[in-house]
A protein has these predicted regions:
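Outer membrane beta-barrel transmembrane domains
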Residues: 31, 39-41, 87-89, 205-306
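Transmembrane beta-barrel strands of outer-membrane/channel proteins
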Residues: 31-37, 74-82, 121-127, 169, ...
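Residues on the lipid-exposed face of transmembrane beta-strands in outer-membrane beta-barrel proteins
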Residues: 52-58, 104-110, 123, 165-171, ...
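Residues that define the transmembrane beta-barrel architecture of outer-membrane proteins
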Residues: 46-52, 72, 98-102, 117, ...
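Long, hydrophobic/aromatic-enriched structural stretches that serve as scaffold segments
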Residues: 69-134
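Short glycine/proline- and aromatic-enriched beta-strand/turn motifs that initiate or cap beta-hairpins
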Residues: 23-64, 69-73, 78-90, 239-250
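Short loop/turn motifs that connect adjacent beta-strands in outer-membrane beta-barrel proteins
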Residues: 23-28, 60-73, 111-118, 172-181, ...
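Gram-negative outer-membrane beta-barrel proteins
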Residues: 39-41, 60-64, 82-88, 127-133, ...
Length: 306
């Protein structure tokens, strides 16, 4: 996947200057966020333990579809996540190491010949310097939950800085007024390097004429622009990835990475006049050879318009 990484990096570098110029003239036109946590899925606190992602959109007023120009719509994204062994107090030596990651990035969303395209980059800080371990310790203390032990934190993935390029291309098939199917392909190179293909199915108005952004951990998509059409929506999706590397599973940890991954997800959204509630669940296949089972993570978003 070396060629893939080179192509992604080049496109991001050469597109960066024009994107910054557009953003300087643009206004904020949307926002979105999603909380993902293992406890909200299978009730555990392990592996892909928890994350929160937030997006702010800049560009011309949203007209119901992506612009055709590269850089005309910019998403600024920030994300923090915790990756942990199964036992935060006395981990199995064959389990994955603890990792805290904090990232910030810019992504552009546009349309070409009917295809939805997202292309961007994130700068990710991994390790104790991210402060994620301290935040989790504070939160667990506040809620009287077992915190990561000194052994876990002292053996976490060391400080690293990774530039990650991400590209996704999808195409929407309108099956009916309320049903849509969107197959997609994704390439990622940096903190994790992989190729992924999958689909998203929606029954209802969720995402119709709205910009949806994909959460990197769960694969769930969340709204960043809103048409506020009342009613229920139901979602399902799946994807398969071929994985080359992950800085969250370094060879020095003694853990062997699985070379494929699968994700299967469902979700539902209720949209009222001024309030919406989203919940989704995703089954994640094992990511390393010592992981004896998959896990289910839950995703939630509650939005109020005042």
């Amino acid at each position: 996947m070396g060629i893939l990484k080179t192509i992604l990096a080049a496109s991001l570098v050469f597109g960066g200057a024009s994107s910054i110029a557009v953003q300087a003239e643009a206004e904020q036109i949307g926002y979105g966020r999603l909380i993902v946590n293992d406890f909200l899925g299978d009730g555990q606190d392990r592996w892909r333990s928890g994350s929160i992602v937030g997006s702010h959109l800049y560009g011309q007023p949203w007209g119901g579809q992506r612009p055709e120009g590269f850089g005309d719509l910019i998403e600024m994204r920030i994300m923090g996540q915790v990756i942990a062994p199964d036992n935060l107090q006395s981990p199995d030596p064959t389990d994955r190491p603890y990792a805290g990651a904090l990232s910030i990035g810019a992504h552009t969303h546009f349309e070409r010949s009917g295809f939805d395209i997202a292309l961007g980059a994130d700068l990710t800080l991994v390790g104790p310097s991210s402060g994620i371990g301290d935040i989790q310790t504070w939160l667990h203390n506040a809620f009287s939950v077992a915190e990561p032990s000194d052994t876990v934190l002292n053996n976490q993935v060391g400080n690293k800085l990774a530039l990650t390029g991400v590209a996704e291309v999808g195409y929407i098939y309108e099956l009916s007024e309320n049903a849509r199917l969107r197959p997609f392909v994704e390439a990622r190179a940096g903190d994790e390097t992989l190729l992924r293909a999958g689909f998203d199915f929606t029954l209802g108005q969720f995402g119709h004429d709205e910009l949806l952004v994909r959460d990197p951990v769960s694969g769930q998509r969340y709204q960043t622009t809103y048409q506020n059409r009342p009613g229920w929506s139901f979602l399902a999706g799946a994807d398969f990835a071929v994985v080359q590397s992950s800085i969250y599973l370094p060879a020095s940890s003694g853990v062997t990475i699985e070379d494929t991954r699968e994700r299967y997800r469902i979700g539902m959204n209720w949209q009222g006049e001024s309030t919406s509630v989203y919940y989704g669940a995703t089954w994640l296949s094992p990511e390393f050879t010592g992981q004896d089972e998959g896990q289910v993570v839950g995703a939630v978003r509650i939005r109020f318009d005042f």
